[in-house]
């Protein structure tokens, strides 16, 4: 019995298998219905070469055919301007239309899709997956809205309207400005070529830059490497925390400059300007450019006190190791060679006097010359455009720079990188410790005193008195006329000393 029961089970399994095979055979599709979409890719390439406008003409010939009928019936949009759908939806024949999720877009200029989709434009970018076509220079960083502007860019979520060449790096709004840039969160309006690196607002200025938090307005060519406010001055410099809202401003941090008389003592690149200075690592390809770090220069009047090579130019200088040949007035501050130069002198310890464009790389003295440079310890007096990257003293000259310890008096546009004093000059700046008095637009980056000046700024601890529009970056006090009397006495003493020095020279 057990043997017969086993045969019956086998027959039952066979009959079930045959029944299942017949059922599957009935449900099989006809091979003639195969589309062959995976056999030939030429159809895809032909579809990609189609003109979007010809596609729109075919849509007009078939008005009863909905090209979006396959999409879920979440919503439909047709023949509208500035229409938006946040999720799944349909869009057609609209301008400046946006879809935040999945969908398709066609026949619109400057259209943006933040997620997955297709676009038929040129030079367009979508932050997610998709394609762009038929618009120029349109960019969308994420989800957002765009309308009535050309060459507009939105980095994240936000709105943009009625501006050209406007850029917003994060979340925010932008309107009615041209060539305006906002790096983070904030608002921008009615300015041109304005840049804000962090959070803040900008308005009514041109070519203004703010590196940190704050506000900027009504100035040109301004740069702010830190926190603070600056306004309505020219040739102003902020060595520490602060902002600049004037012309020919200098930022000692990181950045780029494309103007003239610009100075960036940190890391960066400079190009297309004259009399530009980069204090750290970088390259310069202009005239009167100075790079005190590592770099190369291929122009005239260029100075690189670090490692590098110079050739076939005049007034070229390298402060460290290098070679110079076939030029005039070429100098190397450390180890190097000189060939065919007109200037001579001891490169280690020496003196230079009564000449122009003379340079000493180590210890030395300079007097009565213009454009004099000392690489190490030295003194300078009664000359213009003097630069001392080491320890030294400077007086009675304009456009002087002392990067270490030094003193400055009775000159305009003088700069001391570390410790120093400044009296009776305009636009003077001491990024380290120092004192300032009787000047306009004076700035001290560290500890110092200020009196009787406008728009004075102290980056650290200091005192300010009797001036309007004063800003102190940290702790500060302003009091009494004692500082005024002290400044007057110091100025008189400095004037007497300078007269004696002038007579001796």
Swiss-Prot record:
Modified positions (Leucine amide) in chain numbering: 88, 102, 129, 143, 157, 171, 185, 199, 213, 227, 241, 254, 267, 281, 294, 307, 321, 335, 363, 377, 391, 405, 419, 433, 475
Compartmental location: Secreted
Post-translational modification Pyrrolidone carboxylic acid, affected residues: 106, 465
GO biological process: neuropeptide signaling pathway
Residue numbers carrying Glutamic acid 1-amide: 349
Modified residues (Valine amide): 74
Signal peptide segment: 1-25
Propeptide stretches in the record: 26-62, 495-505
The name this protein goes by in its record: Buccalin
């Amino acid at each position: 019995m057990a043997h017969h029961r086993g045969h019956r089970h086998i027959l039952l399994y066979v009959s079930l298998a045959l029944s299942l095979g017949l059922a599957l055979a009935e449900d099989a599709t006809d091979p003639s219905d195969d589309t062959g979409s995976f056999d030939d890719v030429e159809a895809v390439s032909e579809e990609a070469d189609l003109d979007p406008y010809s596609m729109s003409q075919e849509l007009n010939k078939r008005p009863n055919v909905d090209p979006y009928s396959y999409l879920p019936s979440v919503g439909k949009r047709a023949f509208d301007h500035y229409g938006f759908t946040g999720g799944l939806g349909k869009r057609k024949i609209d301008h400046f239309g946006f879809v935040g999720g999945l969908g398709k877009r066609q026949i619109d200029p400057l259209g943006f899709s933040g997620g997955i989709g297709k676009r038929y434009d040129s030079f367009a970018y979508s932050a997610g997956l998709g394609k762009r076509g038929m618009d120029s220079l349109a960019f969308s960083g994420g989800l957002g809205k765009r309308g009535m502007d050309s060459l507009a860019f939105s980095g994240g979520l936000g709105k943009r309207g009625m501006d050209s060449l406007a850029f917003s790096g994060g979340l925010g709004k932008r309107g009615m400005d041209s060539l305006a840039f906002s790096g983070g969160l904030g608002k921008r309006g009615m300015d041109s070529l304005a840049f804000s690196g962090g959070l803040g607002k900008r308005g009514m200025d041109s070519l203004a830059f703010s590196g940190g938090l704050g506000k900027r307005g009504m100035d040109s060519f301004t740069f702010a490497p830190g926190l603070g406010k600056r306004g309505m001055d020219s040739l102003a410099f902020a060595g520490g925390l602060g902002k600049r809202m004037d012309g020919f401003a200098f930022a000692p941090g990181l950045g780029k400059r494309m103007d003239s008389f610009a100075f960036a003592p940190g890391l960066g690149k400079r190009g297309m300007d004259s009399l530009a200075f980069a204090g750290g690592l970088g390259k310069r390809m202009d005239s009167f450019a100075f790079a005190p770090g590592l770099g190369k220069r291929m122009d005239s009047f260029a100075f690189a006190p670090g490692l590098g090579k110079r050739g076939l130019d005049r007034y070229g200088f390298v402060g460290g190791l290098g070679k110079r040949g076939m030029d005039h007035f070429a100098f190397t501050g450390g180890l190097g060679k000189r060939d065919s130069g007109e200037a001579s002198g001891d490169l280690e310890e020496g003196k230079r006097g009564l000449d122009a464009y003379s340079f000493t790389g180590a210890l030395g003295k300079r007097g009565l010359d213009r454009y004099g440079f000392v690489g190490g310890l030295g003194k300078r007096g009664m000359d213009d455009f003097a630069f001392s990257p080491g320890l030294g003293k400077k007086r009675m000259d304009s456009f002087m720079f002392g990067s270490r310890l030094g003193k400055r008096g009775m000159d305009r546009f003088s700069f001391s990188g570390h410790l120093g004093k400044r009296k009776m000059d305009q636009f003077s700046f001491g990024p380290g410790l120092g004192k300032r008095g009787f000047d306009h637009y004076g700035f001290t980056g560290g500890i110092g005193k200020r009196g009787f000046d406008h728009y004075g700024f102290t980056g650290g601890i200091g005192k300010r008195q009797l001036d309007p529009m004063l800003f102190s970056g940290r702790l500060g006090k302003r009091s009494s006329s004692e500082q005024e009397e002290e400044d007057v006495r110091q100025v008189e003493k400095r004037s007497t000393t300078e007269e004696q020095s002038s007579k001796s020279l």
